[in-house]
Amino acid sequence: MLTRPAQNALLKSMQPLFRFRGCLLAKSTSTPRRDISTSSRKLAHPTTVPIPPSVDDHALVALLDQPSSFGIVSRLFQTQGGLFGHKELQQPSGFITLAEATLVRAQILTNRILRARESQDELRKVVKNLDRLSDMLCGVIDLAELVRNAHPDRAWVEAANQAYETLCEFMNVLNTDVGLYDVLKAVLSDPTIVQGMGPEEYSTAQIFWHDFEKSAINLPPEQRQRFVSLSSEILVLGREFLQEANTARPPASIHASELAGLKDKGMGARLQLQAQFTQKDLLVYPGSLQAQMIMRCAPAEEPRRKLYIAANSSTPSQIELLERLLRTRAELARLVGKESFAHMTLSDKMAKSPENVQYFLDALMDYTRPYARKALRTLSMRKQAHLQTPPFPTIQPWDRDFYCPPEPPAPPIPLPPLTLGTVFAGLSRLFYHLYGISLRPAECAPGEVWHPHVHKLEVVDEDAGVIGWIYADLFARRGKPSGAAHYTVRCSRRTDDDDEAEDGSIPAAEPYVRVSQSFESSKRHRVRGQDGEFQLPLVVLVCEFARPSVSSGPTVLDWHEVMTLFHEMGHAMHSMIGRTEYQNVSGTRCATDFVELPSILMEHFLSSPTVLSLFDVSSSTPSSAWQVGNHHQDPCHSIDTHSQILLAAMDQIYHSPSVVDPSFSSTSALEALHKSRGLIPYVPGTSFQTQFGHLFGYGATYYSYLFDRAIASRVWSQVFHANPLNRELGDKYKREVLKFGGGRDPWKMISHLLDSPWLENGNADAMKEVGQWRIEDEVGQPGRH
């Protein structure tokens, strides 16, 4: 797949919404790693006794919780030895040199592929060489993506941007190279070659084929040029749409009398004093702290109504911008012979078609609606009691937070303060119980990291040794992007059968080739128990936690931050365990509607007291400082889920054939959807769709998160819930799902994991079946009264 890495990199950079030196083989620790005996792996009863923390677990706590561990690396940061251990990246200009070298070597390999029809032997190597070509480019593009987002030095950021743009431009040229397409067509048309392919190789070939087809490669030159033009226009419109989606909406004008009786005695009292002093209406901006407080605490409906309407307003130009984006996508799909953008996008996803997505959403909506109606009835009774109205008044959108105020997420049981090091140690212990994999601190070489507070962790398999690396850039700093992200800087692939000698050579190009080869070869290692030599995965986890200090002590995480770490480490483990022979199907390089399953499933483990015991809660912290458990039922959880289903349905409508109708209106379509399927009334004059940025990043695939939540809930309840530390169950999940990355049909993985053969076809009935599974992920939802 030549397009997906670049596209993913671009989307990550646009979304506000997841890769070294050190020991290459497992070192013996001062005390043996704890062992799970054969008998304990085969426990029939539903409790596996947690194994005590290891030396490495204690080292994780010391590394991440002690302020002293942050001073010793500054020397390593200042002495330049090469970013990620690459001697080519000792200074920013090295990025430009590396990009140029990669271009030269990529062109040489491209020429080899174009000559492949000269011999049957070369045709058999086409898929391997296309994967090499993709990895050659993505290895630099993905690294540049991280650097331009996370590096604090502007010179490095600018160099990374230049390298990124240069290589993405070349990749776009390859995606429309008719010669490459014809060679791959010759390969897939030869039964003897196809029959000799393994499952991974065939999956990789199909990915390349679909990507070429999506690039209009088989169209006449004039239409191909139109495809390129439309694709560029979509990128421009998408950037503009995201900018407008994040533009502040106009303020609501609120009279002081409308704030009478505010339950908030802090900010609310100050607002009332301000209004009395100025003798003017208050101008409150949607999304501000004042607006959030009013939506939660204002007894009168009117100020909440005004703020809701202001928050969901749009200008005519903002609506037209979105509709231009939708129409342009529709034209692109029609150009390649697809009925709609959704049909084009979903052809290689688990859902396969918009019709199947609708089957899933309809089934999920039918299952969820009774629970949501019951929750709304509860809120209606609260409104009735508050306003002394006749029975069951209508709940309006602006009533939601007042009658069901949000709370921060909370653990299921009381816990002492969880430090960053303790949570990482708990993660390591969990991975060891499930997979025989643990995390171990590793030293950084001079110049290896981009900031002195970045730490490197080895990912160690009890049998195979080191299988990859995680760089943890965990602490907030000025200029660092907000939020959490998982960057795959280097994917796995087999390298001993690259056959580089047959690429050919050009004397003038030799210096460039050596630079590119040196960059690649530093990541190649043999793994115990696995045939061949492999490029091991390298991922970076970026967060913005507070830094430990002598005065304030170690970093203590809020519960939502613990959830974030578990989610992102689910992605990281997918990358580490999914070490395939082809980089295009390794780890998280899988279908959009499957990729979130491992990360969402990780959040479910936080609902288990057995798993929480791995945080080693036997501390001397006074119970008054403990995080309080969330014991109450959330009446609004089902309303949240129903609202998400409506958003996914809206996404499908906006990418359906109806968008090409001259009379199409995104606002009218949203209103019609609410009237036919909604439970809370649509408010005339509102147009939330212009703020829904996921319409660009996840166009026609917004259902994916709901879909993976449903599957993760099923996997948790049927596989792990009763015994979440059981090694046999972890091995089954690892064997049936994680190890394949994207190299196997996800439906086959899920059907085998759940022992449900009827799911394997992934047809409309399978989509309906998943839609009927209860989404049991309250652990990932804010608690509410």
Curated annotation (Swiss-Prot):
Superkingdom of origin organism: Eukaryota
Protein's cellular compartments: Mitochondrion matrix
Coiled-coil annotated residue ranges, if any: none
Keyword RNA-binding among record annotations: no
Entry keyword set: Hydrolase, Metal-binding, Metalloprotease, Mitochondrion, Protease, Transit peptide, Zinc
Entry's EC annotation: 3.4.24.59
FT transit peptide: 1-43
Cofactor: Zn(2+)
Family that this chain belongs to: Belongs to the peptidase M3 family.
Function: Cleaves proteins, imported into the mitochondrion, to their mature size. While most mitochondrial precursor proteins are processed to the mature form in one step by mitochondrial processing peptidase (MPP), the sequential cleavage by MIP of an octapeptide after initial processing by MPP is a required step for a subgroup of nuclear-encoded precursor proteins destined for the matrix or the inner membrane.
Protein name according to UniProt: Mitochondrial intermediate peptidase
Organism from which the protein derives: Pleurotus djamor
Originating gene: OCT1
